[in-house]
Regions:
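Short, conserved SAM-binding/catalytic segment
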Residues: 1-5, 230-246
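Core catalytic lobe of class I
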Residues: 1-227, 265
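Conserved SAM/SAH-binding loop
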Residues: 12-17, 246-254
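Short, intrinsically disordered/low-complexity patches at protein termini
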Residues: 43-45, 109, 230-231, 240-242, ...
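Short linear motifs centered on Gly/Pro in flexible linkers and helix caps
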Residues: 53, 230-231, 260
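Alpha-helix boundary/capping detector
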Residues: 83, 101, 211, 235, ...
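Short, basic, helix/turn surface patches
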Residues: 135-143, 243-252
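Long, low-complexity, intrinsically disordered segments
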Residues: 258-268
């Protein structure tokens, strides 16, 4: 490996501009949380005692139409034959992911993340929003780390991301707990594998990957979120290496250079 900073390739850019530089069959595990587009399905504010009203308008970026078909070809191209693809999604996007990916993998399935502390339904007028879906795909030779049938349920349970883990500055509306990301990484990859998250947010997938001895490539278009991700990932590096490695903030001004410097990660 040429560059000792291979572990923390964190880029502030549009993922569509980055993914084209990634070589074919080079990623072991794509674990990502793209927009759900729930903002378009908002039914208005739900008043909650002692806190801001809740609605589906999580952020302006969630209102921009997200088309899974625009990502399917590149995901398939960069994923190794032994790789896995896990995508957090919602009821309104699950079918779209299925339609563009199911026929291109040997197996597609889904996991359920059961949130043990969802927002309450004050007026008891419907189900609690206590579950999120993860669409999963793989081929026959994929990495799969289970030691018993009991572990193989497609169901994972944890609270939503809370303080002190949840960031307040910046506050990301859909920050995922590192604990569930680590569980997925343990299942679907091996130490030293390359994990790719093209919708990195504040870097939780990167934190989980590095804590488990994996390599990580993360891309985030929002500068504030990306800065937070870099800070969190640098903290992990410093904690795990007594001498510490200087955190190389990438020069995001020249996209054409990404293929030259950052992709040293793929060279043994």
């Amino acid at each position: 490996m040429k560059d000792p900073n291979w572990q923390k390739c964190v880029l502030c850019a549009d993922s569509k501009d980055i993914i084209r530089h990634i070589p074919d069959n080079s990623i072991d595990f794509i674990l990502t949380d793209p927009p759900y587009n729930l903002g378009k399905h908002s039914t208005g504010n739900i008043p909650l005692p002692g806190r801001s009203a809740m609605n589906n308008d999580v952020a302006e970026w969630d209102k921009v139409d997200f088309n899974p078909e625009e990502w399917a070809d590149e995901f398939i191209r960069i994923l190794k034959p032994t790789g896995n693809l896990f995508i957090f999604t919602s009821y309104n996007q699950l079918g779209r992911w299925y339609e563009c990916l199911d026929h291109r993998f040997d197996t597609s399935n889904f996991m359920i993340w059961h949130k043990t502390n969802p927002a309450p339904k004050i007026f008891k007028a419907g189900f609690l929003n206590s579950c999120e879906m993860i669409f999963t795909c793989w081929n026959k030779r994929h990495t799969w780390n289970f030691s018993s049938q009991k572990e193989m349920h497609n169901f994972i349970e944890s609270p939503i991301c809370m303080r002190p883990e949840r960031l307040s500055a910046p506050k990301h509306p859909t920050q995922k707990p590192v604990s569930i990301l680590k569980k997925m990484i343990e299942i679907a990859s091996n130490p030293n594998d390359i994990i790719f998250d093209p919708f990195m947010g504040v870097g939780s997938t990167g934190v989980a990957a590095l804590e488990l001895g994996r390599k990580f490539i993360g891309v985030e278009i929002n500068e504030e979120y990306c800065t937070a991700a870099r800070r969190r990932i640098n903290d992990i590096i410093c904690q795990h290496q007594e001498a510490g490695l200087a955190f190389a903030m990438e020069d995001d001004s020249d996209l054409d250079n990404y293929g030259n410097f950052n992709l040293d990660i793929f060279e043994d």
